[in-house]
């Protein structure tokens, strides 16, 4: 089974448990925090990946981290389970998948809006409102400036791209002119 499939299984199960406990958001925050710690600390990742350290040593390190970060029993149990099964390295993907499932459950989308020039707050809000109206979901928009677009905007929602950039329009015109 692929790492991505494994991550999705753990994430989906945890979202279901979080939903039942009313803790979806807090679980997400805890997973994100621990995942960032694991990703940012090479030494910590090395300890968990190194077979020279026994499982008991790894458990002790995990218990200390869980206590220091004040993680919930559910997340603590998940981390211990991943440690026992040698899958702690999958945690960043579990965290990412969990976030996606949690957003789906709560009706949130997180599109990326790229523009050639910085947009005014009113323009961003207008786009956010239009996306919310067309999708029927809460929109948490990530705004980026990409000078290569020249002008216009590109919106990415999941796997879909809505490209209204000047760069793309110029490329289309060039293509039409070349084809005759």
From Swiss-Prot:
GO terms for cellular component: plasma membrane; proton-transporting ATP synthase complex. It comes from the Bacteria. Gene3D superfamilies: N-terminal domain of the delta subunit of the F1F0-ATP synthase. The keyword Cell inner membrane applies. Keywords: ATP synthesis, Cell inner membrane, Cell membrane, CF(1), Hydrogen ion transport, Ion transport, Membrane, Transport. It is found in: Cell inner membrane. SUPFAM superfamilies: N-terminal domain of the delta subunit of the F1F0-ATP synthase. It is a peripheral membrane protein. Its main location: membrane. One of its GO terms (molecular function) is proton-transporting ATP synthase activity, rotational mechanism. Belongs to the ATPase delta chain family. F-type ATPases have 2 components, F(1) - the catalytic core - and F(0) - the membrane proton channel. F(1) has five subunits: alpha(3), beta(3), gamma(1), delta(1), epsilon(1). F(0) has three main subunits: a(1), b(2) and c(10-14). The alpha and beta chains form an alternating ring which encloses part of the gamma chain. F(1) is attached to F(0) by a central stalk formed by the gamma and epsilon chains, while a peripheral stalk is formed by the delta and b chains. PANTHER family: ATP SYNTHASE DELTA CHAIN. F(1)F(0) ATP synthase produces ATP from ADP in the presence of a proton or sodium gradient. F-type ATPases consist of two structural domains, F(1) containing the extramembraneous catalytic core and F(0) containing the membrane proton channel, linked together by a central stalk and a peripheral stalk. During catalysis, ATP synthesis in the catalytic domain of F(1) is coupled via a rotary mechanism of the central stalk subunits to proton translocation. This is ATP synthase subunit delta. The lineage of its organism: Bacteria, Pseudomonadati, Thermodesulfobacteriota, Desulfuromonadia, Geobacterales.
């Amino acid at each position: 089974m692929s790492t991505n499939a494994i991550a999705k299984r753990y994430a989906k199960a945890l979202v279901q448990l979080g939903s039942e406990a009313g803790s979806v958001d807090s679980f997400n925050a805890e997973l994100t925090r621990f995942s960032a710690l694991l990703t940012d600390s090479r030494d910590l990742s090395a300890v968990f990946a190194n077979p020279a350290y026994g499982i008991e040593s790894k458990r002790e390190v995990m218990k200390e981290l869980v206590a220091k970060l004040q993680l919930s029993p559910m997340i603590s149990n998940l981390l211990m389970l991943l440690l026992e099964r040698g899958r702690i390295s999958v945690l960043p993907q579990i965290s990412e998948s969990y976030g996606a499932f949690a957003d789906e459950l709560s009706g949130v989308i997180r599109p990326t809006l790229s523009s050639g020039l910085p947009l005014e707050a009113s323009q961003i809000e207008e786009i956010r409102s239009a996306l919310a109206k067309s999708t029927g979901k809460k929109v948490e928009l990530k705004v980026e400036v990409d000078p290569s677009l020249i002008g216009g905007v590109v919106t990415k929602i999941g796997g879909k791209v809505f490209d209204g950039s000047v760069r793309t329009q110029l490329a289309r015109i060039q293509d039409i002119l070349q084809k005759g």
